[in-house]
C-alpha cells in the first residue's frame, strides 16, 4: 500500500478550484491549495502519512524529487514537466502527468523500465481416455506470463517531427487529441494560464 504522500502546490485556493476538486473546503479560499486540502486528504486514509510543500516547482532543487517512488504532476508548463520527468528517469523513478481542460484531458506515464505479470488463457487438447481413437477434449488453462515495457520520456513524445516520412504515415492512424494536447500546453506556456471558457479572447 501507500506509505506517504506529499501534496505540492504554491497556488492560492480560489472559488473556481472548488468545482474541480473536493479536498479543499470553501472556508479555505485564499489559503494555499495544498494546505487547504490536507485535512480532507488525511481523512481518506488515516494510515497514510500526508504532508505538504508550498514552494513553487521552479524553486525546488533537482535533489527534491528522487526522494519519492512516483511523482504525479499536473497544471505545469511543458518545460517544467520535462524537467521533472528527466530527473525521475535519471534516478529510475516513475513519473505520471496529466491535465483536464473542460471536456478534454490527457495522461502520460513514464514507468522507465517496467516489469509486470499478465494472465494468459490457453486452450489445450486433453485425451478423454487411453485409446488414441477417443476424441480429445479442450481444456482451458490460465498461465502467468512476465512482460517488460520500456517507456519513452515526455520530451521524446512531444518533440516528434510529424513531417518526417516515417511518421507522416501514422497520422491517419493516430489520435488527433495528441495535437489538441500540444496546442493547450503551448497556450499555457505562452500566456502563463489556461484558456478562459468565458471568452474567446487570448
Residue ranges and their predicted role:
Residues 1-202:
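Adenine nucleotide-associated cytosolic modules
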Amino acid at each position: 500500500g501507500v506509505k506517504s504522500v506529499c501534496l505540492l502546490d504554491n497556488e492560492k485556493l480560489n472559488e473556481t478550484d472548488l468545482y474541480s476538486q473536493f479536498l479543499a473546503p470553501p472556508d479555505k479560499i485564499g489559503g494555499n491549495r495544498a494546505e487547504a486540502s490536507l485535512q480532507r486528504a488525511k481523512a481518506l486514509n488515516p494510515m497514510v502519512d500526508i504532508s505538504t510543500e508550498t514552494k513553487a516547482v521552479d524553486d525546488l532543487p533537482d535533489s527534491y524529487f528522487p526522494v519519492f517512488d512516483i511523482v504525479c504532476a499536473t497544471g505545469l508548463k511543458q518545460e517544467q514537466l520535462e524537467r521533472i520527468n528527466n530527473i525521475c528517469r535519471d534516478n529510475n523513478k516513475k513519473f505520471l502527468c496529466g491535465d483536464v481542460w473542460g471536456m478534454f484531458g490527457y495522461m502520460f506515464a513514464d514507468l522507465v523500465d517496467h516489469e509486470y505479470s499478465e494472465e494468459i488463457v490457453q486452450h489445450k487438447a486433453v485425451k478423454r481416455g487411453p485409446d488414441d481413437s477417443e476424441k480429445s477434449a479442450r481444456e482451458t488453462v490460465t498461465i502467468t506470463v512476465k512482460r517488460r515495457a520500456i517507456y519513452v520520456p515526455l520530451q521524446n513524445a512531444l518533440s516528434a517531427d510529424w513531417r518526417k516520412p516515417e511518421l507522416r504515415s501514422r497520422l491517419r492512424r493516430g489520435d488527433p487529441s495528441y495535437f489538441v494536447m500540444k496546442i493547450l500546453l503551448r497556450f499555457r506556456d505562452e500566456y502563463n494560464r489556461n484558456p478562459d471558457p468565458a471568452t474567446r479572447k487570448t
